[in-house]
Amino acid sequence: MSHAKQLHNRRYLNDYLEIINREGLPGNVKSDLCLQVQDTVIATVQHVIEEALAEELYAYLGLARYEHVPWGRPPESTRSGSYQRELITQYGRIADLRVPKLRRGNGALTWQSITRYEHCWGPMLDQHVMGYCLGHSLRDLQEAMALTLGEVLSLAACNRIVLRVSKQMEAFKQQPLASPPPIVLVDGMWVTIAYPTDEISADSQGRRRAVKRKQKRVMLSALGVWPDGHWEIMHWQIAEGETADTWNAFFRALYLKGVTEQTTDLVVSDGSPGLESALDYHLYGVAHQRCIFHKIKQLADYLVFGALEGEEAAVEAPSTRKAKQQRKKAILADAGWVYDGESEADIRARAEVFRDHWQAREPKAVANLLLDFDKTLAYLTIDFPLSLASLIRTTNLLERFHKEMRRKQRDIGMFQSEQGCETLWYLLSRRETAKQRAALSSRL
């Protein structure tokens, strides 16, 4: 049986973590002094929280401990010792936190320091969720939490901690944008998700499990760019493919968030099928920018390598394969040079030079570059800072975000549910948003 499957066995997992704790950690982490410091920190945290609870009770009653009043106190205003409860913090586990209580009416007492059923206090869970966002698997999260909590949580419990963010995710997806961006980048990324079937099988532990089959789905996503240069992921939606119907549903959701014809100046895409009709229906009249990067990249699919023999002799290339690589590199470089122009007139003039130079040898590639050429210059027709043109004439910003998601998908193999996939998408998007806002604040 593989190591990954044996980790589902609680006894095996406990022994595995004990070995890590005993032999896998540096000596300074296991030293007596380090453990003593840890105990002192936990005791200090416990003292501070208990003092905060005592201050809260004083503010609630308006009377100090042992303070008498002539008319006496009702049970609802009389202290009655304390009870002990467990609390887990980012510093460690507090086994016997003393919480003050009243003789009667404890249900009406609302604590601010800790909530009634709060088991994990402070940013401890947030830190582990961020670890998952940064690339830790659920088993990595399980091991990290075991070192903090001193006990082992099941994989299902770790998964519930991550999925707890799903409520925030749903609220974010339905919340209208406070300030809709003038530039919207849209694209799709294919993901692998496991879906349950009607079959039931028994695992190695004899437990009955629903059989899942992996299926391909596309995550449609939208990224907004503002004139100050910062950008954010605004919306995403799982679909079976990039069709007119799925894009219509996607832009309908964006419209409800406040992305309308009045707020949007430009939509940037890579020419996905079905996108044009959805744009005409929901954002009629809005300029549509075709991604320049994809436009140039696709030229390689239309190369016919005409007159390669003469070119091969000119460069003294020893092989046809090397000559083809040189041809591809040269024509892509020239296509990129076309879009280096600073104005529309300059770019069109460069396009004519490109056509004259390559028409005889690569007619299909030249025709593909000039097809819908006006759509690749749509970014020049709107009122937006030219210094930010590189951000709005391609979908590279969105592709960069997709790269992070692909890395995570490679780590985990496939997502076990649509909810898990969307939750990770939300976590990564919020992380990128925080980085963008921090960078914006530093520039102000």
Predicted segments with their positions:
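DNA-binding alpha-helical recognition surfaces that contact promoter or target DNA
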Residues: E55, E143, R160, S277, ...
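DNA-recognition alpha helix
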Residues: R139-G150
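RNase H-like nuclease fold core
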Residues: Y66, R73-P75, R79-S82, R93, ...
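Residues in the helix-turn-helix
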Residues: A52, D140, L153, A157
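Short, conserved DNA-binding cores of transcription-related domains
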Residues: S2-T115
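Short alpha-helical segment immediately N-terminal to, or the first helix within
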Residues: M130-L134
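Conserved beta-strand -> loop -> alpha-helix junction used to position metal-binding or nucleic-acid-contacting
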Residues: L266-P273, A278-A333
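Acidic/histidine-rich catalytic cores and adjacent linkers
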Residues: M1-D32, E55, L63, W337-L444
